[in-house]
C-alpha cells in the first residue's frame, strides 16, 4: 500500500514534467523529423507538381490536415484560401521558441478559471468561435489533466504530423512583420493565460479594424497553434498515463512475485526442517545400532583374549568408533546453524548424511556374504575354550591379537536379515574345528605313544639304529603332521578372497605354533624321563665298568657318549626355538657316529666320560626343574 500511495503523486509529477517539457526536444523531435521527411519523400511526387497552381510549387495549405485538425478541436471548417498558410509556417517556427521552461512553469501552475475566457475574448474580438473553442479545450487539458482516448490520441498524432509536413512545405514563404507581430501575442495568449493583461492590448493595438486580411490569418494562426498545443499535450499526457499504467502493472507483478517468492521460501524452510529432522532420526538409529554391535563385538573379544596385548588395540578401535559417533552427532548441529534461505545446501547436506550409512550398510552386507568365515573365527575360539578342548591349553601367540582385533573394526554394521545365515555358518564352522581338534588329539596321542615305544626300544636294544630313532623321532613326525594338517585345512577352507586367505593363513600359523608348543612340552617331558633313565644307566655302567671292562664294546660307549652330547645339547637349547633343538639333536647323533672306538676302549678315558656325564646330567636336571 505504501508503494501505491507513493506512485500516484509520482505519476502526476512525471505527467507535469512531460507536459512542460519542449515539444521537439529529445527523441520525439527526431522521430517527428524522420516521419516528416518520410512523408515528404512519399508525397513529393504528387504535391511537387503544384496541384493548387501555386507558382513556387508549394502546397497552398487547403489540405485535409488543417481541416481535420479543426474538426478534432471542435471548431468549424474554415475554407479560406491562401492566406492561412503563411502564418502557419511562422507559427510553427515560433511555437517551439516561445514554449520555453519559463512559460511552462506558468502553464503548469494553478491558473484561474477566468483567464481562459479572457483569452477567448481577446481571440474572438477579431471574428470567430473557433479560437474560443480551442482556447477552452486547451484550458481544460491544462487544468484537469484529462486522459483522452487512445484512438483520439492516434488521430491527433496523425494530424500533427501532417500539419508539420505542411509547415515544412510552406517554410519557404516570406513572412510579413505584421503577421509576426500579431502571431506572437496570440500564441502567448493561448499558452499562458496569466499574461492576458499584457498581451491583449498589444494585439488590439496592432490590429487594423477594417482589414479582413489581417484578422483571418490571426484567427487561423491562433486556431492552428491551439490545435497543435492541444494535440501535443494530449499525446504527452496519454504517453505518461500509459507509462504510469505499465509501471502499476509492473509493480503489481513484482508484488505478486515477491509474495510467491516468500511462499516458496516458507515452503523450502519447512522442507529443510523436515529433512533435517529425518536425517537426525536416521543418524540416531544408525548410531544406536552401531553402539549395540560394537558392544557385542567388544564383549566377545574380551572373552576371547586372555593377554593384555590385545586390549590397547581394542580400546583404540572403540575410541575410533566413539569418535565416528560424535562426528555424526555433530553433523545435524552444523546443519541446524545454516541459514534457511540456502535450501539447496541444506538438502544436499542432509542427503549426504543419510546416504553415508546406507552405503556402509550395503558394503558390509557384501562383505558378510562373501567372507562370512572371518566373522565366525573369534566366536569359534570362544566356544572351543568353553567346551574344554585343548585349544584352551595352548599358549596365545603373537598372531592372536591381530586375528581377534581384525574383524572388530570391519563388522560394526550387521544387517538383521543375515543373522540366520551367520548362525548356520558358525555352527558348521564349530563342527569343522571340533573335528580338527579331535584329529589333532589322535595324532598327538599317536606321536606320544610312538615316542614312548622308541624310548623303551632304545633302553632294551642300545644300538646305533635305536639311537637314530631316539634322536630323529621327534623332529620329522611333526613336520609330516603339519603337512597333513595344512592339506586338510586347504581342502576344508578354500579362500574366497584376500581376507579369507589372510584369515586361513593366520589359522595355520596359530595351529603350527600350538603344535610346536605341544611338541616342546612332550619333548621336555621325554627328555626328563630320558635324563632319569640315563642317570640310572650311567650309575649302573660306572659300577659295572670297574668289574667288566673287557665286556664293554663300542656301542655301549657310543650310547653313553650320545647321552652326554644330548645333555649338552639340551643345556644350549632355549624353549622358544624348535630349530635349535632339532639341530642340537642331529649334531649329537653325528658326533656319536664319529667317535673312534679305540678311545672308548681305554678305561681311563671311559671313567672320565662317565664322571662328566653324571655331572652334566645333574646340571641338566636342575636347569629343567628351574624352567618347569
From Swiss-Prot:
Tissue specificity is: Specifically expressed in otolith matrix-producing cells.
Compartments (UniProt record) = Secreted, Extracellular space, Extracellular matrix
Where does this protein have compositionally biased stretches of type Low complexity? Answer: 78-93, 613-628
Q: Main location per UniProt?
A: secreted
Biased composition, Basic and acidic residues: where in the chain? 246-266, 276-285, 311-343
Please name every pair of cysteines joined by a disulfide bond in this record.
none
Q: Where is the composition biased (Polar residues)?
A: 182-214
User: Know the name of this protein?
Assistant: Otolith matrix protein OMM-64
- Record keywords: Extracellular matrix, Glycoprotein, Secreted, Signal
Q: Superkingdom of this entry's organism?
A: Eukaryota
Give the signal peptide, or none: 1-20
The protein's job, in short, is:
Calcium-binding component of otoliths, a calcium carbonate structure of the inner ear involved in hearing and balance sensing. Binds calcium.
Q: Which residues fall in a compositionally biased region of kind Acidic residues?
A: 449-462, 477-489, 514-536, 544-556, 565-578
Entry-listed glycosylation sites: 318
Please give the residue ranges the record annotates as the region Disordered: 43-628
Notes on the domains: The Asp/Glu-rich (acidic) region mediates binding to calcium.
The UniProt entry's GO CC annotations, sorted and at most eight, read: extracellular region
Amino acid at each position: 500500500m505504501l508503494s501505491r500511495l507513493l506512485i500516484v503523486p509520482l505519476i502526476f509529477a512525471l505527467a507535469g514534467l512531460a507536459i512542460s517539457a519542449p515539444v521537439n526536444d529529445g527523441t520525439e523531435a527526431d522521430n517527428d523529423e524522420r516521419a516528416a521527411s518520410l512523408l515528404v519523400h512519399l508525397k513529393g511526387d504528387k504535391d511537387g507538381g503544384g496541384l493548387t497552381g501555386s507558382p513556387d510549387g508549394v502546397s497552398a495549405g487547403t489540405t485535409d490536415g488543417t481541416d481535420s485538425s479543426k474538426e478534432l478541436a471542435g471548431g468549424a471548417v474554415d475554407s479560406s484560401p491562401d492566406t492561412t498558410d503563411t502564418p502557419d509556417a511562422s507559427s510553427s517556427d515560433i511555437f517551439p521558441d516561445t514554449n520555453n521552461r519559463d512559460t511552462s512553469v506558468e502553464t503548469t501552475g494553478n491558473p484561474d478559471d477566468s483567464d481562459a475566457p479572457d483569452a477567448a475574448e481577446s481571440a474572438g474580438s477579431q471574428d470567430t468561435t473557433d479560437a474560443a473553442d480551442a482556447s477552452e479545450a486547451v484550458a481544460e487539458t491544462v487544468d484537469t489533466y484529462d486522459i483522452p482516448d487512445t484512438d483520439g490520441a492516434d488521430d491527433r498524432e496523425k494530424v500533427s504530423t501532417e500539419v508539420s509536413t505542411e509547415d515544412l512545405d510552406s517554410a519557404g514563404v516570406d513572412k510579413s512583420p505584421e503577421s509576426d507581430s500579431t502571431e506572437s501575442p496570440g500564441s502567448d495568449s493561448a499558452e499562458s493565460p496569466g499574461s492576458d493583461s499584457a498581451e491583449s492590448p498589444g494585439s488590439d493595438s496592432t490590429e487594423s479594424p477594417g482589414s479582413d486580411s489581417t484578422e483571418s490569418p490571426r484567427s487561423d494562426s491562433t486556431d492552428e497553434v491551439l490545435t497543435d498545443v492541444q494535440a501535443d499535450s494530449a499525446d504527452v499526457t496519454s504517453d505518461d498515463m500509459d507509462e504510469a499504467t505499465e509501471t502499476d502493472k509492473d509493480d503489481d507483478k513484482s508484488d505478486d512475485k515477491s509474495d510467491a517468492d516468500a511462499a516458496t521460501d516458507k515452503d523450502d524452510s519447512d522442507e529443510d526442517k523436515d529433512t533435517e529432522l529425518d536425517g537426525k532420526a536416521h543418524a540416531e538409529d544408525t548410531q544406536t545400532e552401531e553402539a549395540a554391535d560394537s558392544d557385542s563385538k567388544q564383549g566377545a573379544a574380551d572373552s576371547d583374549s586372555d593377554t593384555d596385548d590385545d586390549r590397547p588395540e581394542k580400546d583404540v578401535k572403540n575410541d575410533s568408533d566413539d569418535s565416528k559417533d560424535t562426528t555424526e552427532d555433530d553433523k545435524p548441529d552444523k546443519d541446524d546453524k545454516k541459514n534457511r534461505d540456502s535450501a539447496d545446501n541444506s538438502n544436499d547436506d542432509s542427503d549426504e548424511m543419510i546416504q553415508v550409512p546406507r552405503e556402509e550398510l550395503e558394503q558390509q552386507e557384501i562383505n558378510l556374504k562373501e567372507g562370512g568365515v572371518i566373522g565366525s573365527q573369534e566366536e569359534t575360539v570362544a566356544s572351543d575354550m568353553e567346551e574344554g578342548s585343548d585349544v584352551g591349553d595352548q599358549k596365545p601367540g603373537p598372531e592372536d591379537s591381530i586375528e581377534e582385533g581384525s574383524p572388530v573394526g570391519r563388522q560394526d554394521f550387521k544387517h538383521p536379515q543375515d543373522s540366520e545365515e551367520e548362525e548356520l555358518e558358525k555352527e558348521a564352522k564349530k563342527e569343522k574345528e571340533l573335528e580338527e581338534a579331535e584329529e589333532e588329539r589322535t595324532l598327538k596321542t599317536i606321536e606320544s605313544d610312538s615316542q614312548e615305544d622308541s624310548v623303551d626300544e632304545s633302553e632294551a636294544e642300545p644300538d646305533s639304529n635305536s639311537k637314530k630313532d631316539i634322536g630323529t623321532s621327534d623332529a620329522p613326525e611333526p613336520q609330516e603332521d603339519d603337512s597333513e594338517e595344512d592339506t586338510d585345512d586347504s581342502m576344508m577352507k578354500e579362500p574366497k578372497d584376500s581376507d579369507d586367505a589372510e584369515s586361513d593363513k593366520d589359522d595355520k600359523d596359530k595351529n603350527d605354533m600350538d603344535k610346536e608348543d605341544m611338541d616342546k612340552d612332550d619333548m621336555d617331558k621325554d627328555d626328563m624321563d630320558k635324563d632319569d633313565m640315563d642317570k640310572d644307566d650311567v650309575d649302573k655302567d660306572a659300577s659295572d665298568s670297574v668289574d667288566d671292562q673287557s665286556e664293554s664294546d663300542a656301542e655301549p660307549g657310543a650310547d653313553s657318549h650320545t647321552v652326554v652330547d644330548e645333555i649338552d645339547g639340551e643345556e644350549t637349547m632355549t624353549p622358544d626355538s624348535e630349530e635349535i633343538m632339532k639341530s642340537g639333536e642331529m649334531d649329537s647323533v653325528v658326533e656319536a657316529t664319529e667317535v673312534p672306538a679305540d678311545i672308548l676302549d681305554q678305561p681311563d678315558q671311559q671313567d672320565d666320560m662317565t664322571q662328566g656325564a653324571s655331572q652334566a646330567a645333574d646340571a641338566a636336571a636342575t636347569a629343567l626343574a628351574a624352567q618347569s
